[in-house]
Structures are given as C-alpha cells and as structure tokens.
Curated annotation (Swiss-Prot):
EC number, UniProt record: 2.5.1.7
Species of the source: Deinococcus deserti (strain DSM 17065 / CIP 109153 / LMG 22923 / VCD115)
Keyword Nucleotidyltransferase (UniProt): no
Protein name as catalogued: UDP-N-acetylglucosamine 1-carboxyvinyltransferase
Location of the active site: 119 (proton donor)
GO cellular component terms attached to this protein's record: cytoplasm
Gene designation per UniProt: murA
InterPro entries: Enolpyruvate_Tfrase_dom (IPR001986), Enolpyruvate_Tfrase_sf (IPR036968), MurA_subfamily (IPR050068), RNA3'P_cycl/enolpyr_Trfase_a/b (IPR013792), UDP_GlcNAc_COvinyl_MurA (IPR005750)
C-alpha cells in the first residue's frame, strides 16, 4: 500500500480528549531486550508504528517469534538465537536498531551489526556504544560498515560515558545483564526510556541498581524468566499534543501521561501563558482566548526540555507575536522543519543551532516532512492555518504517531490520509 499526503483543514479550535500511546522510544529497546530471555514475554502499550514493525522484522531475523495478542499487546518468544548478524537491509532504517549489538552479544557471545540509519538530519555517532563495550571486555572491530563483537566470558568493570547517551546506556546495559560479572556505568543516562528498560529487565529477574541516577550497577544473572510488562506513555507524543493545544489556542485533555515526565514542557508552556492542570494521569491544557508570550528554549538531556519536541515548539512559537529564541545543542542539525515553515509564512532565522523566531499568523501551503519530528511541527502549523495544508512525507509521521488523522479528527480537526493500492508487475 502507498500512503497519500496528509490533508489538514486548519483554523479551527480543537476540543475534547486525546489519549497518548505507549512510548515508541521505550518500546523499541524493550522489544530488543526480550532477546535476552528464552521464555515468553508479553508487552502492553506497544504502538503500532512503522518503527515497531521494523524492529520486529529485525528480532524475527535473530530468532524471535512474535504475535499481536491485543490492539497494542505483543507476545515475544526467543527460544534460541538463530542469527547473530543484523545486516544493513534490516538496520538501515532506524538508529535504535543498533542496540541489538549488546543484546545479541549477551545472549550468543558474538554479534555482527551494521551501522544504523534513521532520520536524515545529521550525524548521531555510536562511538560511546562501542567504547563502553570495549572497556567492559568485549572485542569489537569494524569492517565495511559492520561492527563485529565477541566476548570471552562475562563483561566486567567500570565505564564512564564521555557524554550522556540514551542509546549507549541501553547497549551497555543489555550487554551486561547475563553472566556473572559486575558492571558499573558512570554518567549513564537518566532518561525515562532507560529507566523503563531497566525496570522491564528487573521484572524478568535482572539485577540492575541505580535506575534514574547517573550510576548504574549491573550484576550479571544466568538467565531471565518470562513475564508481562506495560511500557510507559510516550512523553514526546504527549508534549506534541500539548503544543498542538497551545498553537490552536484550544483546550485539550491529554490522557495517559506521566506528568512527572513532562515537567520541562509544562513549565515552558506555562511561561508562555498556557494553563496546565494535572488530573491524575491526564493533563488539561488550556490556551483559549490567551495572548501567548514569546519565550526562549534550550534543549537538554532529560529532565530538561527534550530535543524531540524542539521542532514542534518552533512551530508553536512561529504563531506567537514577539521574538523567541530556540536553541538545540543536543542535535544541532535538527532544522529540516525550518524551510517548510518558511513556506507557510514563518519568520525564522537560523545561525548554527539557534533559531530566532518572529511570530505571526501562518498560512496554509503544501509542505513536505523530511523526518518524524519535522512532520509533527508541520501538522501543528497546519492546524493553526485557515485553509488546507497538504503534508507529504507522511511515512515519517507514521514512524511516531499511530492513526494520526483519525485521532486528530477525534478532537475536532479535519484531517484525511488514505492508502492507495499499488499495482505490482
């Protein structure tokens, strides 16, 4: 099937409730982590996204049997590792696939994994992944774009990450779980997705201490049992919907959230003049009849303002009168949304990783998403404009937002995306 562009009729106030899916960024490494157990694992809250199907293809190649046992529930079973390689054809679509290196190495003692792919907005190196595994005793070589890893016995020792890295922490944790060694990771990521991975592994019998701190101690165990686990809500999707409410000057109830995971986003929106009320696992976001204020935003590692909602915040600020400044030192090249927002009338000047935004009303236009979060920025911008905005590149949106058009319609938007059958020769 081939997807048509997303058609949005904007300029309407939105209303009602929208539920957040399980976290894609938590689900992907947890699916990979299921490789470490020979017993059945059932996961709940798994979003049906293209990235999830990509990682399922990868673990299936390695030896996992899987089936959907509910709308967002997935059963995984890896009795044995049948392939210790992760070829380019399976990993080139998504950077998160590189964490299979640590998982295969732990379960099988050796692995060959190609360099990863993903959104094409600049370099995101994996050097910290490789340095960590080498420091802990793995032998790793690189040849022809492939990493070959081998271990003799259990991983052991201490590694200090040179910078905070979510994926690097994932890989080192996965590699160290099985065996009889003791691994200490310093300057480890405290990101919510890392904590969720650790809590999942511990629920299967792993011995990992320090989740949510910068020091992790992993004591190897001989095997992991099966189990059942629910992934955390997607804080990036939640933040996107919060910004959507603000941009359209609407009131939305965003359900199935962890408010404690969204403190930085909530604080910045409140600084702009948006009312946010916590109600259990929901946030009521109210920007009706408000004169929003420009703000300055700088991305940081968690618990700071997340880079994954930087483009969405830029789209919101493009509608707010006055001068705002957005800086993204975490991923300086995450700027593909800017040229497309220009097509909609946005006044954004870029210097390095800094955007200076002069806010004003936007207008509908045909635009194209070049990556996932740029696509989110464009649908936010499109919903602020009177008239029809047509967003091409919807395959990127489908990497992070399940049934987007249907869910937008549920809160009062007019949005349409269809599938076309493609004739095969």
């Amino acid at each position: 099937m081939q997807l048509t562009p997303l058609h949005i009729q904007g300029g309407r106030e939105l209303r009602g409730e929208i539920a957040v899916q399980g976290s894609k960024n938590a689900a992907l490494p947890i699916i990979v982590a299921s490789l470490l157990s020979s017993e059945k694992v059932t996961l709940h809250g798994i979003p049906r996204l293209s990235d999830v199907y990509t990682i399922l293809d990868l673990v299936h190649h390695i030896g996992t049997q899987h089936q959907w046992v509910g709308p967002n529930s997935l059963e995984l079973h890896t009795p044995s590792i049948v392939n210790t390689d992760a070829p380019y054809a399976l990993v080139n679509k998504m950077r998160a696939s590189f964490v299979v290196l640590g998982a295969i190495l732990a379960r099988a003692g050796q692995a060959r994994v190609s360099m990863p792919g993903g959104c094409a907005w600049g370099p995101r190196p994996v050097d910290q992944h490789v340095k960590a595994l080498r420091a802990l005793g793995a032998e790793i070589s690189e040849e022809g774009g492939n990493f070959h890893a081998r271990r003799q016995g259990s991983l052991n020792g201490t590694f200090v990450f040179e910078l905070l890295t979510v994926g690097g922490t994932h890989n080192a944790v996965l590699a160290a779980v099985l065996g009889d060694g003791v691994v200490t990771l310093e300057n480890a990521s405290i990101d919510t997705d890392v904590v969720d991975l650790i809590e999942f592994l511990n629920s299967l019998g792993a011995d990992i201490q320090g989740a949510g701190t910068n020091t992790l101690v992993i004591r190897g165990v001989q095997q992991l049992r099966g189990g059942e686990y629910t992934v955390i809500p997607d804080r990036i999707e939640a933040g996107t919907f919060m910004m959507l409410a603000a941009a359209t000057r609407s009131q939305l109830t965003v359900r199935n959230v962890r408010p404690d995971h969204l403190r930085a986003v909530s604080a910045k929106l409140q600084e702009m003049g948006v009312d946010i009320l916590e109600a259990g696992n929901s946030l009521i976001v109210d920007a009706r009849q408000r004169e929003l204020r420009p703000v300055n935003v700088t991305t940081q590692s968690y618990p700071g303002f997340p880079t994954d909602v930087q483009p969405q915040m830029s789209a919101l600020l493009a509608t707010v009168p006055g001068t705002s400044v957005v800086q993204d030192p975490v991923y300086p090249d995450r700027l593909t949304h800017v040229a497309e927002l220009h097509r909609m009338g946005a006044n954004i000047t870029v210097s390095g990783y800094t955007q200076v935004i002069q806010g004003s009303a936007l207008h509908a236009a045909p635009v194209k998403a070049a990556d996932l979060r740029a696509g989110a920025a464009l649908f936010i911008a499109g919903l602020t404009c009177t008239g029809e905005t047509v967003i091409d590149g919807v395959q990127y949106l489908n990497r992070g937002y399940e049934n987007l058009a249907e869910r937008l319609c549920g809160i009062g938007a007019t949005a349409q995306q269809t599938e076309l059958a493609v004739a095969m020769d």
